[in-house]
């Protein structure tokens, strides 16, 4: 906030409305519940849905995500972005890929094309300090992270390095 005020001295800061956020979060999660009972809230404005058992009734993951987005827009007047994938990490990254109102499918066939060219700092669970360490080692993209030997990443980052290797290669089974 101080950086924003420094760049824009006339900035008008509006106080947050936590009660409204919670209210809409609950309503959106109720909409999710119409499509699956496997809803895992991640934050006030994000949830993971497992729609595996819902596909026979509602259609594939992309169709379900698009239907949820349409329902939220029509009933609540809000937009949302959705990521559809074979694990939580890639689903989250898919939801970030096209904002503010889109569905992105990251599959086993396309994840290298979509995610690997991205800066390593865009990898879920790579914070600023980790990105700096990776960059210093010449690892600039998610693809380079994926192609780095696991042992080297473990040596650099400990257990987290091994996890990032799995995440970048789509080996996470969440």
Show which residues each predicted segment covers.
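Gly/Gly-Pro- and Ser/Thr-rich, intrinsically disordered tail segments characteristic of DNA damage-repair
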Residues: 1-169
């Amino acid at each position: 906030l101080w950086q924003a005020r420094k760049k824009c001295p006339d900035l008008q800061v509006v106080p947050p409305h936590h009660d409204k956020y919670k209210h809409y979060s609950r309503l959106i999660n109720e909409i999710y519940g119409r499509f699956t009972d496997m809803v895992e809230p991640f934050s006030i404005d994000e949830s993971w849905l497992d729609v595996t058992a819902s596909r026979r009734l509602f259609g594939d993951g992309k169709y379900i995500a698009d239907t949820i987005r349409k329902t939220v827009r029509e009933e609540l007047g809000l937009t949302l972005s959705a990521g559809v994938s074979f694990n939580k990490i890639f689903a989250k990254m898919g939801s970030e890929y096209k904002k503010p109102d889109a569905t992105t499918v990251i599959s086993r066939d396309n994840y290298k094309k979509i995610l690997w060219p991205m800066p390593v700092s865009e990898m879920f669970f790579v914070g600023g300090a980790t990105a700096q360490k990776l960059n210093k080692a010449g690892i600039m993209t998610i693809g380079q992270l994926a192609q780095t030997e696991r042992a080297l990443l473990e040596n650099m980052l400990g257990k987290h390095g091994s996890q990032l290797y799995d995440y970048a290669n789509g080996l996470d089974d969440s």
